Amino acid sequence: RDCLLSRGLGDVYKRQELWESATECPVVFPDGVGVVGWMVPGGREIAIKTAELMKKYDVVIWAHHGMFCSGEDFDLTFGLLHTVEKSAEILVKILSMTPNKLQTITPDNFRSLAKDFKVSLPEEFLYEKQ
């Protein structure tokens, strides 16, 4: 079974499960999201790990805790946060009904979207699922 609970948290985001939940996601966060595995919040170690990931991603999720977002201004940052949260909510609802998605956005759909919206998407995220 290929479901959220049988994969590691990092794999969920590397595979861009969030992108597949809402069409606007690859346009709003084309680099994907970074994930910090569970760590004690509030300490230096988690701050350093988060800062490292924020160099690459505009969104970093703390496993079992929360999310950090960065943008050019408040409105863009709030919109980013809202888009990620909405996509995660859709994903959770889908996976609560079935472990396998019955339909999804294909890699070629993502490539077309990227072309039309003039964004670059990492090819490593664009592959056919087995």
Go through each PLM region and give its residues:
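Single conserved hydrophobic/aromatic residue that forms the stacking wall/gate
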Residues: D2-L9, Y13
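A contiguous pocket-lining binding segment that forms or flanks enzyme active sites
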Residues: E20-K55, G71
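Gly/Ser/Thr-rich active-site loops/lids in small-molecule metabolic enzymes
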Residues: K14-V33, G37, F78-L95
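Generic alpha-helical secondary structure signal
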Residues: Q16, R44-I48, D75, D108
